[in-house]
């Protein structure tokens, strides 16, 4: 039988494979295509930051260097100047730690959730306005769900909104009705701490 040497123990055919073999490197370098995808994603993230409203941008956790780059991009008005500055924003973002990038992503996702809720609420108000203008019975239901509403005020606004529409006047009371409905929903939410149900027309 051939004696086992150090080299033979390391060979693929050894009875004890890997006895002296080095640990495989699990942290393999990223491919060029993966790097390109990562760069594109960070560039898009930077564009989202640049487009944020000022108050929301102030609430996003980010390093000072990135905040400065974003603010400079927002101040830049020329197309070419903004393009170059946004490239710089992307460069700064590529230097961030993974946890910093994730914190930014989490903040942006939170804003998207808030925006969806705000949009849904606006649609709810518009739906109530549509029902109230179309059917007097809808007011009874609205008052039942929002008992704190000033009945006479809302009724007068509805009548005025209908009249101005018939006469082709500017939609002053149409807008006032929106605000009255919004105020009633806000009051209910403050009292109950829950989102009001979406109204559906009675069968």
Swiss-Prot record:
Pfam families hit by this protein: DarP
Residue ranges, compositional bias (Polar residues): 1-13
Gene Ontology biological process terms from the UniProt entry: assembly of large subunit precursor of preribosome
Compositionally biased intervals (Basic and acidic residues): 27-39
Xref: CDD domains: YjgA-like (cd16331)
SUPFAM superfamilies attached to this UniProt entry: PSPTO4464-like
Similarity comment: family membership: Belongs to the DarP family.
Function: Member of a network of 50S ribosomal subunit biogenesis factors which assembles along the 30S-50S interface, preventing incorrect 23S rRNA structures from forming. Promotes peptidyl transferase center (PTC) maturation.
Official protein name in the record: Dual-action ribosomal maturation protein DarP
Native source organism of the sequence: Cupriavidus pinatubonensis (strain JMP 134 / LMG 1197)
Gene behind this protein: darP
């Amino acid at each position: 039988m051939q004696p086992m040497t150090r080299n033979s123990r390391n060979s693929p055919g050894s009875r004890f494979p890997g006895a002296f073999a080095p640990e495989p490197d699990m942290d393999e370098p990223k491919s060029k295509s993966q790097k390109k995808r990562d760069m594109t994603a960070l560039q898009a993230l930077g564009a989202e930051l640049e487009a944020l409203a000022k108050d929301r941008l102030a609430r996003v956790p980010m390093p000072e260097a990135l905040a400065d780059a974003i603010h400079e991009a927002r101040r830049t008005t020329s197309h070419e100047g903004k393009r170059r500055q946004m490239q710089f924003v992307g460069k700064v973002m590529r230097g961030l730690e993974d946890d910093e990038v994730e914190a930014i992503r989490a903040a942006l996702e939170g804003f998207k959730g808030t925006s969806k809720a705000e949009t849904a609420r606006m649609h709810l108000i518009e739906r109530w306005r549509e029902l109230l203008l179309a059917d007097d019975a809808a007011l009874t239901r609205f008052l039942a769900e929002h008992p704190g509403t000033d009945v006479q005020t809302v009724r007068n606004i509805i009548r005025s909104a209908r009249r101005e529409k018939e006469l082709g006047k500017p939609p002053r009371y149409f807008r006032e009705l929106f605000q009255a409905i919004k105020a009633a929903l806000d009051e209910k939410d403050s009292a109950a701490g829950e989102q009001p149900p979406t109204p559906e027309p009675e069968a």
